[in-house]
């Protein structure tokens, strides 16, 4: 990085105060590697670069430097991990990019561009300017091969913010669905309390006192991502993997949990929704104070939880989340669903009649599951989906797209 700065100084371009074009392929060094191998350098960069926030990777500061090296009117182009498009730690970088003009972003994530690197790449071409023209359009391109385009969308820059770039790569009808989904300005965290279930330290403390027992007085069941299905806890049905341990009936005593964290104890003893953390769709289950959400789950507390449970487990919400965060999916299409993804779900205004209808249907599902965990509740879930489609204002053609996914 220092040699690049020295090179810029040596060229001495006072008339333009920068380069006409900056092109680069930054090193793909992730935050964990930097912390372990170059912690002092990472700390220095965090103080120098405004975009180096959160668990940032090395490419973030390279792009910021590249934009800074351009004169006002210069062009920059980079090949990058597609984490640029939606990762939380690239939000500051996206803010910097949208201040200027985005000429195009190409998504190569489905192609083996780098044979020996586990990276899903994209390319970006941008124009540094002090007078952004919001009437200009940006191109968002999905590549079929390295040379062949599968789909190209043109989007006015005035509607491009610093979040949700994934949607600009989608088809016109998918874009319309997401536009309706995001049109509701109340988000989930405005009405409910969203909490990460455990810190790393708490997770390891829990491991020390976790035990296996089908029955246990003054204790709590424990579930995690692998033992949660939509509406259904798989406790006692499916074994739980937890930090190199395996439990069929995982429990923790109330006193042990109180010792680890009084706050976690109070959360566990409360009515709540527990959401799985790693899944291809949202999987949320209701709990009335009998269960502790283990490592990697998210907890939601507040009123009207049965109404919210119906929304979260609906096809439309999972469809939308999968599009909005497509570029940060892992192998197999799995998405790390945490507090950020949950908090920002738009919540439509429901009339008392519609809300009561959803709550009644959710009650019906929960009653069926209580009687028999294997009982089919798809007819009730489909009725909830129909009400959710209406709340978000989807057309029949848009509903078909969601249902087909």
Predicted regions and their residues:
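Signature of N6-adenine DNA methyltransferases within the class I
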Residues: 2-212, 286-297, 305, 333-342
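Short helix-capping/linker segments at secondary-structure and domain boundaries
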Residues: 131-133, 230-234, 395-398
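Alpha-helix initiation and N-capping motif
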Residues: 4, 38, 90, 102, ...
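Residues that form or flank phosphate/diphosphate-binding pockets in enzymes
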Residues: 88, 307, 356-358
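Generic, well-ordered alpha-helical scaffold segments in large soluble proteins
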Residues: 10, 22-25, 29, 44, ...
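Short intrinsically disordered coil segments
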Residues: 137-147, 237-242, 289-290, 315, ...
């Amino acid at each position: 990085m220092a040699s690049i700065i020295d090179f810029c100084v040596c060229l001495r371009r006072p008339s333009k105060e920068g380069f006409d074009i900056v092109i680069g392929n930054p090193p793909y060094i992730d935050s964990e590697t930097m912390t372990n191998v170059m912690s002092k350098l990472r700390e220095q960069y965090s103080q120098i670069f405004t975009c180096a926030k959160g668990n940032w990777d090395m490419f973030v500061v390279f792009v910021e430097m590249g934009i800074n090296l351009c004169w006002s009117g210069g062009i920059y182009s980079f090949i990058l991990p597609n984490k640029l498009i939606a990762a939380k730690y690239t939000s500051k970088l996206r803010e910097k990019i949208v201040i200027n003009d985005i000429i195009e972003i190409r998504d190569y994530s489905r192609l083996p561009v780098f044979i020996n690197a586990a990276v899903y790449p994209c390319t970006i071409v941008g124009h540094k300017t002090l007078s952004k023209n919001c009437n200009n359009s940006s191109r968002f391109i999905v590549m079929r091969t390295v040379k062949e385009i599968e789909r190209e969308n043109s989007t006015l820059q005035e509607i491009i913010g610093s979040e949700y770039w994934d949607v600009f790569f989608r088809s016109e009808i998918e874009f319309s669905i997401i536009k309706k989904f995001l049109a509701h300005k109340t988000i989930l965290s405005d009405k409910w309390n969203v909490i990460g279930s455990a810190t790393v330290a708490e997770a390891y403390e829990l491991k020390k006192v976790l035990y296996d027992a089908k029955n246990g007085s003054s204790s709590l069941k424990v579930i995690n991502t692998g033992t949660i299905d939509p509406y259904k806890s798989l406790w006692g049905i499916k074994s739980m993997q937890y930090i190199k341990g395996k439990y069929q009936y995982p429990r923790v005593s109330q006193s042990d949990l109180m010792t680890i964290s009084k706050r976690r104890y109070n959360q566990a003893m409360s009515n709540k929704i527990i959401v799985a953390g790693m899944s291809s769709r949202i999987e949320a289950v209701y709990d009335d104070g009998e269960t502790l959400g283990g490592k990697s789950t998210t907890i939601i507390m507040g009123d009207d939880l049965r109404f919210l449970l119906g929304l979260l487990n609906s096809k439309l919400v999972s469809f939308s989340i999968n599009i909005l965060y497509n570029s940060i999916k892992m192998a197999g299409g799995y998405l790390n669903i945490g507090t950020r993804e949950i908090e920002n779900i738009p919540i439509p205004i429901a009339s008392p009649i519609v809300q009561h209808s959803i709550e009644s249907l959710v009650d019906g599902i929960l009653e069926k599951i209580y009687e028999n965990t294997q009982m089919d509740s798809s007819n009730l879930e489909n009725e909830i989906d129909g009400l959710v489609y209406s709340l978000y204002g989807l057309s029949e053609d848009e509903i078909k797209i969601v249902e087909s996914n």
